[in-house]
């Protein structure tokens, strides 16, 4: 009987964002859900200061050892003068068939790690460099959505150069009395503030500029319902059932504290009961957003639904969480795809996209050279 070769998966997690520990919990769940008869899994923890630990060292942290201690031991083994020292352990993983990154936020969702995988010529789960970078930047995301006629909230972009031109009175005239202030390139609700007066506006803008040199000021939606959808696929993606997040009435929005410090007052409705018409509209908007941004593999799309039932696309998450309370896998579970099957499908999509992109030519081919062109086969 022929023995089937296992697929070697590199599970990369951690990172330098505020979601470092969340990423570790996501990685634990993904690892536990993987069929070990089908996959060999190597673990790679990216420390907070940007050093990739070896599989053996990552497993020690996985098993509960202190990350800083293990990282110090690992870094001592590598020539610090080598500019590639931080990713040395990845360079030793020559037989990896596919990478599964689950680094949330900075470095993981902004196109950085995807560019590294491209240089390594390795398949990877999730969207490519461009789609990741555009989706991580809230301003660029909104520009794409607006160009495609996909409803999103009105906003103004502040930079160090134009910041002085947008005092609170100017913002009021454009967006109303109540606004949200957000760093353009941040996740986890870090640096986000709601402002309803001059001082709140000044304080919120000052804090947001600590995290990015581009800050969004957005109109608020009165009493919104926060709804989410999971998308899975490449050229022909499918959408999950919808879910909703309920935060305590005393809280202004689903903020960093709700997510990571004290989530005791937060509840999730999966699936959420909405009208058929609204459900269809949100689902269609999700698929349109996915296509407009050129997303691949997976994404979770967040919406704000106004009191009168009008949905607005909020944010797009290209590497959503896989923790016990994360909605991305929960929504698929409610739709009929269990955790293990979801992981299998994501890996299959990564391999499919890699081979699809590998058919493209990157060097000049003369028009009379039909040898290369004849090998092209349109993707089904």
Curated annotation (Swiss-Prot):
Pathway: Cell wall biogenesis; peptidoglycan biosynthesis
Binding-site residues for ATP, renumbered to this chain: 172-227
EC number(s) on file: 6.3.2.4
Domain of life: Bacteria
Primary residence: cytoplasm
Cofactor(s) needed: Mg(2+); Mn(2+)
Binding site for Mg(2+) 2: 315, 317
Sites where the protein binds Mg(2+) 1: 302, 315
A GO biological-process term: peptidoglycan biosynthetic process
Signal peptide coordinates: none
PROSITE patterns listed in its UniProt record: ATP_GRASP, DALA_DALA_LIGASE_1, DALA_DALA_LIGASE_2
Pfam families (alphabetical): Dala_Dala_lig_C, Dala_Dala_lig_N
InterPro entries: ATP-grasp, ATP_grasp_subdomain_1, D-Ala_lig_Van_CS, D_ala_D_ala, Dala_Dala_lig_C, Dala_Dala_lig_N, PreATP-grasp_dom_sf
Domain ATP-grasp, chain residue ranges per copy: 142-348
Subcellular location: Cytoplasm
Molecular functions per Gene Ontology: ATP binding; D-alanine-D-alanine ligase activity; metal ion binding
Keywords: ATP-binding, Cell shape, Cell wall biogenesis/degradation, Cytoplasm, Ligase, Magnesium, Manganese, Metal-binding, Nucleotide-binding, Peptidoglycan synthesis
Gene Ontology cellular component terms for the protein in this record: cytosol
Cofactor: record remark: Binds 2 magnesium or manganese ions per subunit.
Catalysed reactions, semicolon-separated: 2 D-alanine + ATP = D-alanyl-D-alanine + ADP + phosphate + H(+)
NCBIfam families: D_ala_D_alaTIGR (TIGR01205), PRK01966.1-4 (NF002528)
Family of the protein in this entry: Belongs to the D-alanine--D-alanine ligase family.
Function: Cell wall formation.
HAMAP family membership: Dala_Dala_lig
Protein name: D-alanine--D-alanine ligase
Naturally occurring in which organism (per UniProt): Levilactobacillus brevis (strain ATCC 367 / BCRC 12310 / CIP 105137 / JCM 1170 / LMG 11437 / NCIMB 947 / NCTC 947)
């Amino acid at each position: 009987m022929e023995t089937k070769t296992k697929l070697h998966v590199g599970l990369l997690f951690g990172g330098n964002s505020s979601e470092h520990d969340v990423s570790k919990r996501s990685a634990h769940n993904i690892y536990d859900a993987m069929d070990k008869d089908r996959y060999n899994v190597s673990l790679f923890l990216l420390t907070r200061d940007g050093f990739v630990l070896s599989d053996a060292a990552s497993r020690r942290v996985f098993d509960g050892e202190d990350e800083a201690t293990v990282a110090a031991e690992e870094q001592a083994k590598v020539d610090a003068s080598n500019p590639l020292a931080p990713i040395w352990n990845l360079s030793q993983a020559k037989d990896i068939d596919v990478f599964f990154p689950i680094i949330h936020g900075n470095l993981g969702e902004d196109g950085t790690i995807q560019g590294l995988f491209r240089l390594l010529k390795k398949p990877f789960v999730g969207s490519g460099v461009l789609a990741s970078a555009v989706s991580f930047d809230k301003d660029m995301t909104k520009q794409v959505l607006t160009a495609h006629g996909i409803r999103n909230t009105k906003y103004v972009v502040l930079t160090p150069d134009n910041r002085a031109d947008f005092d609170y009175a100017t913002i009021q005239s454009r967006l109303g009395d109540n606004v949200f202030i957000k760093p353009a390139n941040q996740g986890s609700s870090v640096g986000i503030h709601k402002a309803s007066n001059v001082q709140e506006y000044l304080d919120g803008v000052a804090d947001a500029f600590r995290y990015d040199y581009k800050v969004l000021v957005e109109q608020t939606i009165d009493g919104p319902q926060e709804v989410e959808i999971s998308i899975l696929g490449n050229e022909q993606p499918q959408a999950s059932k919808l879910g909703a997040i309920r935060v305590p009435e005393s809280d202004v929005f689903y903020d960093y504290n709700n997510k990571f410090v004290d989530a005791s007052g937060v509840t999730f409705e999966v699936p959420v009961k909405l009208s058929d018409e609204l459900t269809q509209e949100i689902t269609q908007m999700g698929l349109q957003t996915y296509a407009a941004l050129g997303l691949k593999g997976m994404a979770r799309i967040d919406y704000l639904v106004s009191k009168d039932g009008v949905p607005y696309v909020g944010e797009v998450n290209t590497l959503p969480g896989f923790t016990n309370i994360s909605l991305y896998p929960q929504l698929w579970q409610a739709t009929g795809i269990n955790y293990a099957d979801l992981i299998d499908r994501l890996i299959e999509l990564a391999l499919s996209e890699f081979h699809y992109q590998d058919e493209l030519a990157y060097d000049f081919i003369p028009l009379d050279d039909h040898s290369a062109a004849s090998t092209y086969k349109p993707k089904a």
